[in-house]
Amino acid sequence: MKQYLDLMKHILAEGVDKSDRTGTGTRSVFGYQMRFDLSKGFPLVSTKKCHMRSIIHELLWFLKGETNVAYLRENKVSIWDEWADDNGDLGPVYGAQWRSWPTQSGDAIDQISQVIAQIKSQPDSRRLIVSAWNVGELDKMALAPCHAFFQFYVADGKLSCQLYQRSCDVFLGLPFNIASYALLTMMVAQQCDLALGDFVWTGGDTHLYSNHMEQTALQLSREPMPLPTMTILRRPESIFDYQFDDFELTNYAPHPHIKAPVAV
């Protein structure tokens, strides 16, 4: 994906060196946007191999409303292990906020069910938003939400989605985030009988960690391959009934995987 490589080049050329919470150090830019036409292929980075299995299982885990890593571990996905406590708990992270945002009255709001109902009944609404940034519960979360909120947009029978990501690890995290929200958009579009529009990614503090520079240079030396195709093989009754085997990725011919340390 040229857009992703262009972002890396932009950070290297225009970014500033900053300290960060992890003590690793970053090169950072503030405010950046990329747009992907989902009708032209699935936006999965090809200049290194991405683990689509982890991306799918993490998204299904979010949609289940779960915040314990047990489901992920059962499916050999370890991307949240560094932040989990001894019992595998992460506090009220994405799944909790998406599916059961607590209200002052003691009720809970299922934002995913709500936004799908709104897309179907009020497609021109400007309030088709899901937020994970619950200020009242940030201190209970193992990690504050990086991909903080997203908005759907319906026009000409097509569904688009824009994600705002307040903090972005460009080398390790961003390929996952783009693919995850592109897939979520496909699922919601199917549930709402809409064609695919764009996925728009907007970043706040968008950075390369200082210990990812060699890996970034290697990735920039590689030529992007054509976009693969993601097919949803089945339409379940609801957004919450998808299974891992419902998704088929074809024509993905990436360059080899590049290892890099995670900043915790």
Curated annotation (Swiss-Prot):
Q: GO:BP terms for this protein? A: dTMP biosynthetic process; dTTP biosynthetic process; methylation
For this record, an example GO cellular component is: cytosol
Give the residues the record marks as binding dUMP: 21, 126-127, 166-169, 177, 207-209
Q: Spell out the subcellular localization from the entry.
A: Cytoplasm
- Binding annotation for (6R)-5,10-methylene-5,6,7,8-tetrahydrofolate: 51, 169, 263
Q: Which SUPFAM superfamilies match?
A: Thymidylate synthase/dCMP hydroxymethylase (SSF55831)
InterPro entries named in the record: Thymidate_synth/dCMP_Mease, Thymidate_synth/dCMP_Mease_dom, Thymidate_synth/dCMP_Mease_sf, Thymidylate_synthase, Thymidylate_synthase_AS
Q: In which pathway does it act?
A: Pyrimidine metabolism; dTTP biosynthesis
Q: According to its UniProt record, where is this protein mainly located? A: cytoplasm
Q: Which residues form the active site?
A: 146 (nucleophile)
Q: Which GO terms describe its molecular function?
A: thymidylate synthase activity
Please provide the record's keywords in A-Z order: Cytoplasm, Methyltransferase, Nucleotide biosynthesis, Transferase
At the top of the EC hierarchy, this enzyme's class is transferase
Instruction: Report the catalytic activity.
Output: dUMP + (6R)-5,10-methylene-5,6,7,8-tetrahydrofolate = 7,8-dihydrofolate + dTMP
SUBUNIT field:
Homodimer.
Which family would the database say this protein is a member of? Belongs to the thymidylate synthase family. Bacterial-type ThyA subfamily.
HAMAP family given in the database record: Thymidy_synth_bact
Entry function: Catalyzes the reductive methylation of 2'-deoxyuridine-5'-monophosphate (dUMP) to 2'-deoxythymidine-5'-monophosphate (dTMP) while utilizing 5,10-methylenetetrahydrofolate (mTHF) as the methyl donor and reductant in the reaction, yielding dihydrofolate (DHF) as a by-product. This enzymatic reaction provides an intracellular de novo source of dTMP, an essential precursor for DNA biosynthesis.
Q: What name does UniProt use for this protein?
A: Thymidylate synthase
To which species is this protein native?
Answer: Shewanella baltica (strain OS185)
- What is the organism lineage in this UniProt record? Bacteria, Pseudomonadati, Pseudomonadota, Gammaproteobacteria, Alteromonadales
